[in-house]
Each structure stands twice: as structure tokens, then as C-alpha cells.
Amino acid sequence: STRYMTLFPYTTLFRSHDKCISCGKCHQSCPYHAIVYIPVPCEDVCPVKAISKDEYGVEHIDESKCIYCGKCINACPFGAIFEISQVFDILQSIKRGEKVVAMVAPAILGQFSEPIDQIYGALKAIGFSDVIEVAQGAMVTTEKEAHELEEKLEEGQAFMTTSCCPSYIQLAKKHMPEMEKYISTTKSPMYYTAEIVKAKDPEAKTVFIGPCIAKRKEARYHDNV
């Protein structure tokens, strides 16, 4: 007792950080709430537990678990988690006189109160050479996916899930591998919209504009976006 108090004169208990794994058992067991759990918003909202602290208490995002849903970005009150913007690269391309086409997600109608023509006009005023709705690509996806579903059902497959949501695809691949075989092989609306643009002008650069973080991650997987 004397030796312990000499080493730690201000407390009778000491937690060894070398041994603690932050399991929370002490917090749950203490009847006097002397051990306080400080919630971490980004950790708490992550549906796949992809965010955690390392041994130094620094938060890290595990890419092998992340499904790019964006909940952590919305939850962080300090703006510590943010997207890597490509706005500067786009503006540089426009400034160089390159043909840059804006592919706009249908969700834009719910993001702004102004008439859609005014929004498209603003994009062209910025320097985009053309604006195309991703809904055009969605029509292609719908048709191809419908045919694929018919084929899968004829083969005896019980059901088929969409290929349009990149967040769901990541969820299936990383956390529900048994569901991966049911994902449609049809490309997403973004992909087919980019194909439409490239068919008209192979040299055109395509820029996806939409609120979905996972779809912006998806754009990095396709060379034509």
C-alpha cells in the first residue's frame, strides 16, 4: 500500500494503458459511474465499425470495412472527416479549355429550390461544355437489369439485388459475402451515362455531380468517369 501510494500519490487505482483494450467492462461494472465513457460520434454512427482508435488514441478508418456511407462525415461536429475534393482539378480542366461534361444525379432536384434549367445554366456558366442527366443512364441500367433478372430466375436463382448502390455493394463484399453472388452484374447509371457522353466525344471528361459519397467513390473505379 505504501509503495503504491508512493508511485501514485493522487489515486488508489491506476489503469495500465499497455494492458487496457478499451472493452468497457470497468465502465459497465462501476456502480458509482466513476469511469466515464466519452462517446465518439464518428465511431458511434458507423454501421460497420470501421472507425476506431489506435494505441495512441488517434482515430483511423479501416478501408477493409468502410462502405463509404458518409455517416461519419455528418456526425463529426468538428469537420475532422471530410471528402477529398476534385473541384480544383475540374476547374483546371475547364480553364485549359478541355471539354468537361457534367453528369447530374436526379437527386439534384431535391437539393435546390431553383428551377432545374437555372441550375444547368449555372453549370454551363461555370464552364461545363454540356450537362447530361444521369437518369439517361438509369434507363439503360433498368432495361439491362430487368433482362438479367429474367435470366437469373429462369436459371433457378431465388432473387437478385441491385448494382446501383455502391455502398450496398461494398457492404455485401466486405460484410455479407454470402450475398455477393446475388448482386446484379449490370453497370450503374453513372457508368452508362458516361458511356453515352464518350460515344459522342471520346475525348470529353465526365464529372459526376450528386450528394452520394459512395457514388463519388464509385467514380474512381471507372476509367470513363
Residue ranges: model-predicted function:
Residues 1-12:
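Single conserved hydrophobic/aromatic residue that forms the stacking wall/gate
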Residues 6, 39, 44, 52, ...:
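Generic structural signal for beta-strand residues in well-ordered domains
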Residues 8, 37, 126:
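Residue-level signal for short amphipathic helical patches enriched in basic/charged
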Residues 11-59, 66-78:
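Hydrophobic alpha-helical bundles that form the membrane domains of multi-pass transporters
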Residues 46, 60-65, 87-96:
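Short cysteine/histidine-rich metal-coordination sites, predominantly Zn2+-binding motifs
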